[in-house]
Amino acid sequence: VPMPPRRASPDAWRRPAAQVSRLDSDAASHRMRARKPMIMPRVVCPSPVSSVDGNQSIGTLTHAGCRNTVVFSSASGGAGTSVFAAMVAWRLAQRKLQCALVDCDFAAGGIDVLLGIENEPGLRFQTVDIPLGKTEGAALNGELPQWERVGVLASQPWNGSDPEPWTVSAVLEALAQANDVVVVDIGAPSALHSLPMLRQCRQVVLAELTVLGLARARAARAMMIRQGESRPIMVGVVPRGL
């Protein structure tokens, strides 16, 4: 007996579209699960007031007048300390914090060349003149060349002698009072021997993620703790050259 023809329901045309939509949704959901999450770099802003026994957040200081100074160094040459310090200063400036970047690597210097502002007018460490051992931070800020809304005080050892320790101390204290954050690049941790005013500042040490780089970083960390300096924050880096 022949079966009577099935009468299509009025909304039968919707079913293929619904199935396609469900398949697209399932495929999109699968792609989202398979996709690795994007991890954005996090920059910790310093707290205006921190205790000596505070946590490991960037900006904790014991040096009076420089509570918002952060010192960057690396036990391995070419690890990108200057670039890392400049990027931290740049990110802080993006967060609407007034930031100064200071080049205290008096053996090599040249952070203004790295940033492409070597021809910009303004102060360099070799041209700072503080005869009375004290200066106004706001006036000093106004004399610094700017890079991405960051005032930069570079060192140019090829254009003069190293500044006197009291000049460095006066500059750092003035900048700390006139800025939210002062980022200091000293090159190597051993530079703290000639920069005693920075020994109790928050230290960030870059460790190159190689066998030799980690051994150097471990020795530098032990030396800093042994000499009574603040326990450093260690940051692992993998330099990528040409």
Stretches found by the model and what they are:
Residues 170-242:
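Conserved catalytic-core segment of NTP-binding enzymes
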Residues 70, 100-102, 151-153, 202-205, ...:
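Hydrophobic/aromatic beta-strand patches that form the interior of the parallel beta-sheet core
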Residues 109-111, 160, 191-193:
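Conserved protein kinase catalytic core
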Residues 92-152:
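Phosphate-binding loop that captures ATP/GTP phosphates
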Residues 134-189:
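Cytosolic-facing regulatory segments adjacent to core modules
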Residues 80, 106, 135, 163-170, ...:
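Charged, alpha-helix-enriched surfaces in structured cytosolic catalytic cores
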Residues 1-70, 118-138, 201, 215, ...:
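Acidic-aromatic/histidine active-site loop/patch
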